[in-house]
UniProtKB/Swiss-Prot annotation:
Name the UniProt record assigns to this protein: ATP-dependent (S)-NAD(P)H-hydrate dehydratase
Lineage: Eukaryota, Metazoa, Chordata, Tunicata, Ascidiacea
Coiled-coil region: none
Domain YjeF C-terminal: 61-350
EC identifiers of the protein: 4.2.1.93
Length: 359
């Protein structure tokens, strides 16, 4: 069994005091390199038994996330802060790709492209003139036409509103293969996860990919890999998430729930920010859009944690803060559009680096 790394600013699985050296705040500091918030837990035969509630520290993951956010500058040109693509959108589902794309823009992406079916394009265009919409997914030569656009985009979300039409799924499979060859970061959600469940080999070993399953999607993915998914406690859920990530060759898993679990191979962090008890549709689309943007930023930086792990953590944090703020204002009437309205406030208060030059 290999060593598993756990990160601060979250619930951390720790050994008992007899198995590690603890600092004055109760933080396990054994095997820490330069005390940068990376905790190495010595593996045990039994699952970890003790959860330690960590305090936010100077070198937390949130601090690491701030470092990758590009400073606003008069000297930059359009596109440098991020060009995000959303591959999804069908006749039945037009809101999901819109939520993902507009959320990426509200978090700081300069441009957002939506690649959807022809029947969805006019509707999505009507939601916002800020999105660039390509009605290409269901045309006969879709992959050839998309070849012009895919390399121009820094990161992609695959799945929001995609639908399960076989012809479209086959097109998306070809797109995925091309994105892997081009080494472009991708986030896969919703019907994109359905595609991966049918054929996990599509994504196996691609460590620039993040999968974002909810509880049901996690069960299906685990079944497809012949893994356990029935744990009822956080310890077991963490180990299951790590196991799925490793079974997929190190692909990052963001297991959504009351406590979000982000696992990148043997490295994992949990995020227990309080979100909203209002479970309106579209919150996962906001999450995936913001995560794709963070994934571009983290891969374009020299951050200490794995880029996909940091991107997953930052996006989960931002989404839950947005949900909480929106619920405080709107209560039972909270909708995803209310969460999107909170993105700027949450971003400014938690991710803007006050020392960055704004010139």
């Amino acid at each position: 069994m290999s060593t598993i790394l756990f990160y601060t600013r979250a619930l951390i699985i720790g050994a008992t005091k007899s198995q590690g050296v603890f600092g004055k705040t109760g933080t396990l500091v054994a095997n820490i390199s330069s005390n940068r918030g990376i905790i190495s837990i010595v593996p045990r035969t039994n699952p970890p038994q003790k959860l330690l509630k960590m305090q936010e520290e100077e070198n937390s993951l949130l601090e690491e996330a701030r470092k990758v956010v590009p400073a606003l500058s008069f000297g930059k040109h359009k596109g440098q802060a991020g060009r995000v693509g959303v591959i999804g959108g069908s006749e039945e589902y037009t809101g999901a790709p819109y939520f993902a794309a507009i959320s990426a823009m509200k978090a700081g992406a300069d441009l957002a492209h939506v690649f959807c079916s022809k029947s969805a394009s006019t509707v999505i265009k009507s939601y916002s003139p800020e999105l660039i919409v390509h009605p290409l997914l269901d045309v006969p030569n879709a992959v050839t036409l998309l070849d012009e656009w895919l390399p121009r985009i820094h990161s992609h979300v695959i799945g929001p509103g995609l639908g399960r039409v076989d012809a479209t799924l086959n097109t998306v499979k070809e797109i995925l293969i091309k994105l892997k060859k081009q080494e472009i970061p991708i986030v896969i959600d919703a019907d994109g996860l359905f595609l991966i469940t049918r054929d996990p080999s599509i994504i196996h070993g691609y460590t620039k990919a993040i999968l974002t399953p909810n509880v049901v999607e996690f069960q299906r993915l685990s079944k497809s890999m012949n893994l356990n998914w029935e744990s009822k406690d956080l310890n077991g859920s963490i180990m299951e998430t790590v196991a799925l990530s490793k079974a997929l060759g190190g692909v990052t898993i963001v297991r959504k729930g009351e406590v979000d679990i982000v696992a990148a191979g043997d490295e994992v962090v949990t995020m227990d920010e309080i979100g909203s008890p209002r479970r309106c549709g579209g919150q996962g689309d906001l999450l995936s859009g913001v995560m794709a943007l963070f994934s571009y930023w983290t891969h374009n930086s020299t951050c200490t944690p794995p880029p996909t792990l940091l991107a997953g953590y930052a996006a989960c944090f931002l989404t839950k803060r947005c949900a909480n703020q929106a619920f405080q204002k709107h209560g039972r009437s909270t909708a995803t559009t209310d969460l999107i309205s909170e993105i700027n406030s949450v971003f400014v208060n938690n991710f803007e680096n006050p020392t960055d030059p704004k010139s």
